[in-house]
């Protein structure tokens, strides 16, 4: 008896499958994917984006994270810590790997189906063997591979965009946490100042040297300072805990986290428009992502035009029939074709849906392209405005307030003003410093947003109006 594999029909089937396999199938290499993501987001990850797949790799990550926590964590170190330590970051990388693998799977040919049957009819015994595979799937394999490649590329771009979003969140959260810590220190000074004023007013009233109205004003300042201190304390906790969550720190690691006492100094000069435009021209992820979505839709539309009409399956068959009555044996063989007939459904709605999806992707690409320049202009304007405001506080407002404080100190020493005037001026000076801290915070938030905008992932930054300086309303005696 001849083997089924020697039947010409089977040879043809196996030849077609072999050709399809040799033609190449879509595949995903995790290391190459991460290398590409690091190349696209080098200014954000410094090439340290990596997925731990073994216990040894996880231990190495934890050791590196622990080493970073032994010193004060700056903004750059915070990003490194998130890349090394955050389970959410690792989950994002693993999910991207899964999405790319599923995209690659869609570009591969389905496995053939082998069927075996045994039938007895009287004295006849028949064994049937059928090898079936999707003929249309085989014919359209190059198209499906092209779609899979586009989906893999789309997944890689999406990964880069998510990495930029995540690192930008870490940068901005670090800025808020440090600014909140710095503001809390000055809020404590205001509170201590107001507390001293309220206590002095109470004692002066007790000996008849202060009226009730003046004492009530000092007590009001003290109560307001206590409220502001509580709010600043809660704001510092919230900002720090937000950063802890983004870094993926556990309780022990959170206890080790040390942040700087103040924000970094402003750069000597703001970035110039020409420099920003040059950096932005190197490629925007939002446009790349929209373009890849259009490419996927366009290729899928061409394939759906064929698949929506019909489906074809080819089966190669070889049977063995034993006739016990005559003692003979026969080996009928042949093939069968399964064809789905488009009688009730011609696939018009599926084709319309694909056409609409492609049209939507094309218009989305146009919308993203048109909005790109607007987002960049807005981000740069916010950056430059925040820089100018912060520099104005540093170079003008704070020095002027210090000069006023120095002059009032001299006047107090000469007994030209009382202690309450001096305390009120001290409160105003601290309030000015806190406004300067807020201005620096706005700048560094805008700086992080601008860096994200250069690659097409703006987060949006609003510049808060500076609060008007409030005098302590000093009362003499």
Task: Go through each PLM region and give its residues.
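Terminal intrinsically disordered/low-complexity segments used for targeting and assembly
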Residues: 2-84, 233-279, 449-477
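Periplasmic alpha-helical coiled-coil/stalk elements that build and connect Gram-negative outer-membrane
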Residues: 2, 141, 157-279, 379-382, ...
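Short, charged, amphipathic alpha-helical segments
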Residues: 93, 146-149, 212-221, 419-427
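Small/polar, glycine/serine/threonine/aspartate-rich low-complexity segments that form flexible
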Residues: 61-71, 112-145, 258-270, 301-302, ...
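Short segments within alpha-helical structural elements
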Residues: 195, 224-252, 398-456
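A glycine-/polar-enriched beta->alpha junction
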Residues: 84-112, 129-147, 157-164, 168, ...
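Alpha-helical heptad-repeat coiled-coil segments that mediate oligomerization/polymerization in large
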Residues: 211, 372, 379, 415-419
